[in-house]
UniProtKB/Swiss-Prot annotation:
Gene3D superfamilies tied to this protein: SH2 domain (3.30.505.10), SH3 Domains (2.30.30.40), Transferase(Phosphotransferase) domain 1 (1.10.510.10)
Enzyme Commission no: 2.7.10.2
Name of the protein: Tyrosine-protein kinase Srms
Pfam families: PK_Tyr_Ser-Thr (PF07714), SH2 (PF00017), SH3_9 (PF14604)
Domain of life the protein comes from: Eukaryota
Binding site for ATP: L240, G241, E242, G243, F244, F245, G246, E247, V248, K262
């Protein structure tokens, strides 16, 4: 009788409760009291957001406004998102996900199942930004310690990360997702939504040792066109080397972002052309080219800021103990990667002018990226000329460029042939023992560098083609890329 009446006449549930009191095992869930009753309201056990799993099927949205008629009910407004904790006949005991955390009973007829929505309307959610960009945002003058944001995770597809400013640094926390769909920072602390997670850690911030005070203010100049940055944003930490354009340093941007900083003396630069040249360079994007981050051209010295590659330049790396242990497939892989980058520059009609192993950078995973493309054009004519002696890299430069300053994609091809020689000699200097003058003299007489001991014969054939006296007879980078890739494939097939 009881189950039948409770199911058919749910609107008299308060009356059935008087006739058939609830079992003690169910006292933790408040039941509806009638309008005429005046019970002493029970204090429902506080529902911690972390105490319940959050399967996606238990998310609801309020279809209509509902005003609670007693302490056990929960008032909701149309559009409110709720998480169902337990079904109670024609009611759902739910937790409201928007606004102050609260729980109570809501009639099922007032609700509809909802699907999780990306929190794009929240001021603390930043979509489409990376970890490095989050650091820039939070460390900007507009944001103080305690500023925070949530962003999509870079390492976990569909996941999130919490980034919080703590004085002069930014702390990042991965927000994990349990199989049930719950979110957590710490195991055992489960939350049905990002709102609930933030609400909990705003109160219990000591668990992550950083208070969550206010959402990040998105007014940092992170627009891609704003390349000019104040020099004060960069700290030079360790000198990595020195080349024709100045010194290269490992540095930190905004106190936490590792970067490479090329320091150039203004006396050697055509500063009037710098902005125009940077405008051209920043449009070049390829996985085999170093990414340009920023420039500092106001005052002296000029900074050109790029991404940092862990193993430094290719010439130095090849001469290291780790580099000397590399096998032929690795060396050929370097050649193929550089050819890919140069082929892209060729398609964009960009002339490098200073292609050499010292201007190719190596990552921790042995990826190669071409650097300093186009910068030689910024050097003053009296600096980058044969008469200036050591400033011009004669041993890497095509004869027509070294003698007459005729630079082209085909003069880059000549330099690529010299780079191949460096790769297959593990960083050895070309024309060793010769002066610049002697080098040019010998080249004009037909001398070409010999085949390195570990260099495959078919690769050396490509080197010699790169060193044709007539630029028109030299291959394009597109052809070099295809031929090197073909040699690489045959080598790997032979090894397997």
């Amino acid at each position: 009788m009881e189950p039948f009446l409770r199911k058919r006449l749910t609107f008299l549930s308060f009356f059935w409760d008087k006739i058939w009191p609830a079992d003690e095992s169910e006292e933790d869930i408040p039941r509806i009291q009638g309008h005429d009753d005046n019970p002493v309201p029970e204090q429902a056990a506080a529902v911690e957001p972390c105490s319940f799993p959050a399967p996606r099927a238990r998310l609801f949205r309020a279809l209509y406004d509902f005003t609670a008629r007693c302490a056990e009910e929960l008032s909701v407004s149309r559009g409110d998102r709720l998480y169902a904790l337990k079904e109670e006949g024609d009611y759902i005991f739910a937790q409201r996900l928007s606004g102050p955390p609260s729980t109570g009973l809501v009639p099922v007829t007032y609700l509809a199942k909802a699907t999780p929505e990306p929190p794009s309307d929240q001021p603390w959610y930043f979509s489409g930004i990376s970890r490095a960009q989050a650091q820039q945002l939070l460390l900007s003058p507009a944001n103080a310690p305690g500023a925070f944001l949530i962003r999509p995770s870079e390492s976990s597809i569909g996941g999130y990360s919490l980034s919080v400013r703590a004085q002069a640094k930014v702390c990042h926390y991965r927000i994990c997702m349990a199989p049930s769909g719950s979110l957590y920072l710490q195991e055992g602390q489960l939350f049905p939504s990002l709102d609930a997670l933030l609400a909990y850690y705003k109160t219990n911030w000591k668990l992550i040792q950083n208070p969550l005070l206010q959402p990040c203010i998105p007014q940092i100049p992170l627009v891609q066109d704003e390349w000019e940055r104040p020099r004060s944003e960069f700290v030079l930490r360790r000198k990595l080397g020195e080349g024709f354009f100045g010194e290269v340093w490992e540095g930190l941007w905004l106190g936490s972002i590792p970067v490479a900083v090329k320091v150039i003396k203004s006396a050697d630069m055509k500063l009037a052309d710098l902005t125009k040249e940077i405008e051209a360079l920043k449009s070049l994007r390829h996985e085999r080219l170093i990414r340009l981050h920023a420039i500092c051209s106001l005052g002296e010295p000029v900074y050109i800021v790029t991404e940092l590659m862990g193993k430094g330049n290719l010439q130095v790396y090849l001469g290291s103990s780790e580099g000397k242990a590399l096998s032929l497939p690795h060396l050929l892989g370097f050649a193929c990667q550089v050819a890919e980058g140069m082929s892209y520059l060729e398609e964009r009609r960009v002339v490098h002018r200073d292609l050499a192993a010292r201007n190719v950078l190596v990552g921790d995973d042995l990826t190669c990226k071409v650097a300093d493309f186009g910068l030689a054009r910024l050097l003053k004519d009296d600096v980058y000329s044969p008469s200036s002696g050591s400033k011009i890299p004669v041993k890497w430069t095509a004869p027509e460029a070294a003698n007459y300053r005729v630079f082209s994609q085909k003069s880059d091809v000549w330099s690529f042939g010299i780079l191949l020689y460096e790769v297959f000699t593990y960083g050895q200097c070309p024309y060793e023992g010769m002066t610049n003058h002697e080098t040019l003299q010998q080249i004009s007489r037909g001398y070409r560098l010999p085949r390195p001991a570990v260099c495959p014969a078919e690769v050396y054939v490509l080197m010699v083609e790169c060193w044709k006296g007539s630029p028109e007879e030299r291959p394009t980078f597109a052809i070099l890329r295809e031929k090197l890739n073909a040699i690489n494939r045959r080598l790997h097939l032979g090894l397997t």
